[in-house]
């Protein structure tokens, strides 16, 4: 509802821009304004998977971490700068790209479904979990390595994200989401570690 969304406090301009549009849509729907026969706004969480190497530093941590780990080099994670969160225990909802595609395909085959939906796994996992999964899929032992969080990020750094999937499930989407470990294994073994990572 517009009231619920109005209480949200984005941490950065990117989040503010997404919320502003979602709020606009919610207000239009609440006012019974004309809408297309089907419409959907999807809020993707931390998407990872194959075919994102063109994104450079904006690629997922999985894609950035693997080539370093594969060479036997450490990939340092950000230290926590909060006393109540241990190093590496910062949590994100990492969602495999195939699952995002699955939601989109489902919407395309269910023209009666419209709305704003979160698209994530519904589980918050730690960066330590992610690092361990990348090392395991790369055939390397994991030894934690740390670096300080840049000062420019500290004020707006997210310590926890987790998709609330109730609206998506109530709309009828029932497919399970890929586990972090399985998604990382597919990404690395079937794509990133292959001679042609884009096949």
Could you describe each region identified by the protein language model?
Residues 13, 52-57, 156-159:
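Short, solvent-exposed loop/turn segments at secondary-structure boundaries
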Residues 11, 43-45, 120:
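Active-site beta-alpha turn of Rossmann-fold NAD(P)-dependent dehydrogenases/reductases
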Residues 17:
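Active-site helix of classical SDR
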Residues 9, 54, 111:
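Active-site loop immediately N-terminal to the catalytic Tyr-X3-Lys motif
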Residues 71-199:
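C-terminal substrate-binding subdomain of Rossmann-fold SDR/epimerase-dehydratase oxidoreductases
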Residues 11-14, 92:
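Catalytic tyrosine of NAD(P)H-dependent dehydrogenase/reductases that use a Tyr as the general acid/base
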Residues 2-10:
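Short alpha-helical oligomerization interface
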Residues 23-102, 133-135:
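NAD(P)-dependent short-chain dehydrogenase/reductase
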């Amino acid at each position: 509802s517009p009231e619920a969304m109005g209480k949200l406090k984005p941490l950065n301009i990117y989040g503010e821009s997404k919320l502003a549009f979602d709020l606009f849509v919610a207000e239009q729907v609440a006012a019974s304004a004309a809408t297309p026969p089907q419409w959907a706004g999807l809020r993707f969480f931390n998407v990872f998977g194959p075919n994102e190497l063109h994104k450079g530093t904006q690629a997922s941590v999985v894609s950035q971490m693997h080539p370093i780990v594969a060479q036997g080099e450490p990939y340092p994670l950000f230290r926590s700068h909060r006393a109540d969160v241990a190093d590496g225990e910062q949590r994100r909802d990492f969602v495999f790209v195939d699952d995002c595609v699955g939601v989109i395909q489902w919407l395309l085959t269910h023209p009666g479904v419209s709305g704003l939906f979160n698209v994530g796994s519904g589980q918050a996992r730690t960066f330590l979990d992610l690092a361990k999964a990348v090392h395991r899929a790369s055939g390397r032992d994991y030894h934690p390595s740390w670096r300080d969080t840049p000062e420019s990020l500290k004020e707006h750094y997210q310590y926890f994200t987790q998709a609330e999937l109730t609206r998506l499930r109530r709309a009828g989407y029932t497919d399970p989401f890929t586990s972090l470990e399985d998604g990382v294994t597919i990404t690395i073994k079937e794509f990133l570690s292959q001679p042609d990572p884009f096949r």
